[in-house]
């Protein structure tokens, strides 16, 4: 895979490979775009089958966060952290705090929130090592300020966008 070529073609700014063998941390932080502000996105803890799978997921999800932030008219860009681990058996305070130290090295370019496999308590551990993220997002992942919104039959809302309709699965904590 031509990683730098892919990143350039998709508009990614940075990828950080994080390794701390002492605590078993293997993580990737992808920053897609910081034009509107710091990259914001959750930290996904997942037992990826390969490093390449984890890298591609981080890149894909960071790009999606750029568009979510822009659609919600937030002064944020898109980013994503992924930790290669089983959230049920390998997640420890030491691992999360180590991840927080890597987030801190980005000096505010990336703000970490929760995602699949991570909890509010996990973010407290991350936050002990960085003032840049490590908090639960209070922002909805679906923007509430479109032209018109009404409850849908399922969860969440249906938003009317000056023409096409788009369904969103509620507020969620995942990106």
Regions inferred by a protein language model and the residue ranges of each:
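Glycine/serine-rich phosphate-binding loop and adjoining beta1-alpha1 elements at the start
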Residues: 69-71, 75-174
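N-terminal glycine-rich anion-binding loops that anchor highly charged ligand groups
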Residues: 22-38, 70-75
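Gly/Ser/Thr-rich helix-start
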Residues: 25, 38, 42-43, 78-82, ...
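Short helix/loop capping segments that flank catalytic or ligand/cofactor-binding pockets
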Residues: 26-27, 54, 93
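Residues in well-ordered beta-strands of folded domains
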Residues: 17-19, 30-32, 46, 84, ...
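N-terminal cap/recognition module
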Residues: 31-66
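GHKL/Histidine-kinase-like ATPase module
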Residues: 12-17, 23-30, 42
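Short, Gly/Pro- and small/polar-rich lid/capping loops
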Residues: 1-19
């Amino acid at each position: 895979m031509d990683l730098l070529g892919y990143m350039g073609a998709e508009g990614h700014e940075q990828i950080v490979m994080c390794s701390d063998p002492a605590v078993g941390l293997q993580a990737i932080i992808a920053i897609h775009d910081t034009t509107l502000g710091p990259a914001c996105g959750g930290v996904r803890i997942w037992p990826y089958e390969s490093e390449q799978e984890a890298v591609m997921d981080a890149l894909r999800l960071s790009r999606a966060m750029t568009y979510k932030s822009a659609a919600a008219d937030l002064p944020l860009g898109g980013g994503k952290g992924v930790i290669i681990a089983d959230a049920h058996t390998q997640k420890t305070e030491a691992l999360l705090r180590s991840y927080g130290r890597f987030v801190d090295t980005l000096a505010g370019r990336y703000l970490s929130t929760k995602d699949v496999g991570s909890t509010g308590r996990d973010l407290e551990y991350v936050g002990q090592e960085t003032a840049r993220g490590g908090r639960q997002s209070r922002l909805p992942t679906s923007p509430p300020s479109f032209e018109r919104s009404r409850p849908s039959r399922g969860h969440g809302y249906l938003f009317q966008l000056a023409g096409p309709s788009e369904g969103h699965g509620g507020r969620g904590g995942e990106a």
